[in-house]
Swiss-Prot record:
SUPFAM superfamilies: Winged helix' DNA-binding domain. NCBIfam families: HTH_metalloreg. One of its GO terms (biological process) is response to cadmium ion. Residues 58-77 bind DNA. This is Cadmium resistance transcriptional regulatory protein CadC. CDD domains: HTH_ARSR. Homodimer. Metal-binding repressor for the cad operon. Involved in resistance to heavy metals, such as cadmium, bismuth, zinc or lead. Metal binding causes the repressor to dissociate from the DNA. Cd(2+) binds at C6, C10, C57, C59. Residues 23-118 form the HTH arsR-type domain. It holds the Pfam family HTH_5. Keywords: Cadmium, Cadmium resistance, DNA-binding, Metal-binding, Plasmid, Transcription, Transcription regulation, Transposable element. It comes from the Bacteria.
Length: 119
């Protein structure tokens, strides 16, 4: 039987220090929050759609993610509450977009880095 943990404690101080120093410059909390927000497959599809087309109405998004308008609206409200999406009303239609360029850039970076990665 193979054991997937170290059988002895042997710490490489240089590696540990290097990684800890690097972690001080990484926005770990922000990245963690984005991963939590994107932990739902439907929300990932919605965000991807909003990256592809800058703005989409709820009906189009529901069709894209193959969900009801009600379920899609629920996810969109969640994304808005988390600061990821904005909306505007135009007559009887509601259009959603990503909140700003900073959000767009961070999410694009995350999604592009995971293309083709098998989990």
């Amino acid at each position: 039987m193979t054991v997937d943990i170290c059988e002895i404690t042997c710490i490489d101080e240089e590696k540990v220090k290097r990684v800890k120093t690097g972690l001080e410059t990484v926005e770990v909390t922000t990245i963690s929050q984005i991963f939590k927000i994107l932990s739902d497959e439907t929300r990932v599809k919605i965000v991807y759609a909003l990256l592809t087309e800058n703005e989409l109405c709820v009906c189009d998004l529901a069709n894209i993610v193959e969900a009801t308008v009600a379920a899609t609206s629920h996810h969109l409200r969640f994304l808005k509450k988390q600061g990821i999406a904005n909306y505007r009303k135009d007559g009887k239609l509601v259009y959603y977009s990503l909140a700003n360029e900073r959000v767009r850039d961070r999410i694009k970076l995350i999604l592009l880095n995971f293309e083709g990665v098998g989990v």
